[in-house]
Amino acid sequence: MSDAAVAGGRTARRGRLGTEARDARRALQLVLAAIWLLDAVLQDQSFMYSKAFSQMIGGTAAGNPGVIARPITWNANLVEQHAVLLNTVFATIQLLIGLGIAFRPTVRVALAGSIAWACAVWWFGEGLGGVLSGAANPFNGAPGAVIIYALLAVLLWPADRVARAPFTAARAVGAHVARALWLVLWLSLAYFALTPANRAPQALNGVITAMETGEPGWLIALDNGAASLVRGQGLAASVFLAVALVVIAAGVYLRPPAAKTALVLAVVVAAVIWVFGEALGGILTGVGTDPNSGPLLALLALAYWPLRTTVPGEEKAA
């Protein structure tokens, strides 16, 4: 075979690898868009137009420093006074973000808007996810589901710093930054799992049973089974979870086969958190504003799945 033919074959294979990477990022963007659209639908539930919604927002101020709590209380009072108008605005913003990400020409504007909106909601609506109040727990959505939306927007930004990134999340910010962001997130979850409040004997049991109100019977049965397993085992459960989270955090620094194992573990942990700790984000109760952190953590793991960045036979031929 001539050198020209070999070179042409390599170029074609490189093109296919580039297309694979582009398609992977676009697929993840579309999943993120679907979650934003689900949020918009959930935001339009009747509960969100009631006084109870503003009270739920106000409750996130508890335990936070005054400089953080006062704006939350102000926001809750404002929502109470103008519930219909403001909740309609909230739902519309989320709808526009979802549609904007799904529509390729507006994806940059929508992702940028989602970062700004997520940061505002993280403070004014989630009380920074309980990070400063001592209430943060991986099983109740720490460090705040909405800040993970912002992280995903950054990692799925349609730009390329390197020609062939090792995983999708590295394309926009580079592998070193992407791995550092992953490390910070999962190590923070490990830290939250080991805080004194979460090591208490009945801590995890209480988190699981607290989500039962309004759930369908089958989900209550699942949660009750999980709660019984961890009854009085708060310390052991916290240590076990923290170890798993540390393994996940370090996984993206390993070679692809080991990294894939760590990422599968991340998806499994995200699923366990979502089903048993977050009760599917409360989306079946009529009061859930979003699916919570579980699906977002799983989506994040997919963004770090190793891509095939070398052309088969290329190194041998060289």
Q: How would you name each of these model-derived features?
A:
Residues 2-96, 103-318:
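Extended, low-polarity transmembrane helix blocks
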